[in-house]
């Protein structure tokens, strides 16, 4: 009848206990969340949960739990979190539907076609700009990207085509001391466009307008003099090598020309204005994760080796105790035998004294 007794339910995990459990799971996550299912990994997970339970129970202000309860609690937390994340993804898909996906696909397609032909232009502060944008341009935080060698043509049907960029002699305006001015406009052919991509993913284009550079744009302290007009070339792959040789692309000052309307928009850049994280950062993160994984495995190995050594020491101590007990029992047996033979010898000497053995035999001559 003892098996039919009603067991009391365990206490619910408090927020403090859940935080302690999550911290310990984060510590051993590379072992507990391993996707392997071989016998060695399963045994390692079992020992890891036992070690985690030992550390959990050693924390203050927590109830004593076994590793099965901790494992079940972690599985419930994980399942609940996955359910919430799936619900958020569904809600996000309802809000941002196929329109944003089409813009994303278009920008990714253009980026895959021309990955190495773009360089980035720094946005000038508002006080340095010589003209005011339209109302729509003031509301958008746009980043400008200019193409060097190729142009991308996107017609009304959405087809993408490329053609070589027609280069025009460029002007290099230098001060008397040989240093370039603070802002230089790179000359492009008439009808060249700049791509405006706002944060919402909308793509717009406007023509590049040029303005002559005056003496006031030279470096501070340089005397005002006539500027020499020469060819100034910005190589494709050396744009980022020397910052002193980079010309900052910027919009011109007030202009009377209005923006023309084209049947097919000429785009000279794509969504790659937001540069992806550098490969070095990705490799560093991977190395850090591998390092944490190796450290967790080494820590588990040290714990296992410590447990093995403790078990060996306990076994040796038990063997020593057993040997001592066996030796004590043997000594007791030997002492009993010694006492037995001593008592027997005493009885023999009493019955047959030693002096009687020295008497001559009666029949001796």
From Swiss-Prot:
Keywords (A to Z) from UniProt: Coiled coil
Protein name: Myb/SANT-like DNA-binding domain-containing protein 3
Keyword Transcription regulation (UniProt): no
The Myb-like domain, residue ranges: 13-78
Organism per entry: Xenopus laevis
InterPro entries hit by this protein: Myb_DNA-bind_5
Regions annotated as coiled coil: 301-337
Lineage: Eukaryota, Metazoa, Chordata, Craniata, Vertebrata
Signal peptide feature range: none
Source taxon at top rank: Eukaryota
Family to which the UniProt record says this protein belongs: Belongs to the MSANTD3 family.
């Amino acid at each position: 009848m003892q098996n039919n007794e009603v067991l009391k339910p365990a206490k619910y995990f408090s927020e403090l206990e859940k935080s302690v459990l999550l911290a310990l799971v984060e510590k051993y996550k590379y072992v507990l969340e391993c996707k392997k299912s071989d016998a060695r990994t399963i045994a390692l997970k079992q020992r890891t949960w036992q070690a985690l339970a030992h550390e959990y129970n050693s924390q203050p202000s927590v109830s004593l739990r076994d590793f099965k309860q901790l494992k079940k609690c972690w599985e419930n937390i994980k399942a609940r979190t996955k359910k919430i994340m799936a619900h958020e993804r569904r809600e996000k898909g309802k809000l941002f539907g196929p329109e944003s996906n089409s813009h994303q696909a278009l920008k990714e397609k253009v980026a895959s076609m021309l990955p190495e032909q773009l360089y980035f232009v720094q946005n000038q502060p508002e006080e340095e700009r010589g003209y005011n944008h339209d109302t729509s341009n003031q509301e958008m935080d746009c980043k400008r990207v200019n193409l060097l060698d190729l142009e991308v043509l996107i017609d009304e049907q959405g087809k993408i085509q490329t053609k070589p960029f027609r280069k025009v002699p460029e002007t290099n305006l230098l001060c008397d001391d040989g240093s370039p001015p603070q802002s230089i406009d790179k000359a492009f052919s008439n009808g060249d466009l700049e791509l405006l991509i706002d944060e919402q993913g909308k793509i717009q284009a406007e023509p590049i307008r040029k303005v002559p550079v005056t003496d006031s744009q030279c470096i501070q302290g340089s005397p005002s003099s006539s500027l020499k007009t020469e060819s100034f070339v910005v190589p494709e792959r050396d744009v980022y090598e020397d910052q002193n040789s980079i010309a900052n692309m910027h919009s011109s000052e007030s202009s009377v020309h209005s923006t023309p309307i084209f049947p097919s928009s000429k785009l000279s850049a794509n969504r790659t204005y937001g540069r992806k994280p550098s490969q070095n950062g990705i490799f560093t993160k991977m190395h850090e994760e591998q390092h944490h994984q190796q450290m967790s495995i080494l820590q588990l190995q040290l714990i296992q080796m410590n447990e093995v050594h403790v078990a060996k020491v306990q076994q040796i101590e038990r063997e020593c105790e057993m040997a001592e007990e066996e030796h004590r029992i043997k000594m007791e047996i030997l002492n009993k035998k010694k006492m037995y033979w001593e008592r027997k010898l005493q009885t023999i000497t009493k019955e047959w004294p030693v002096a009687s053995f020295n008497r001559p035999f009666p029949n001796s001559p």
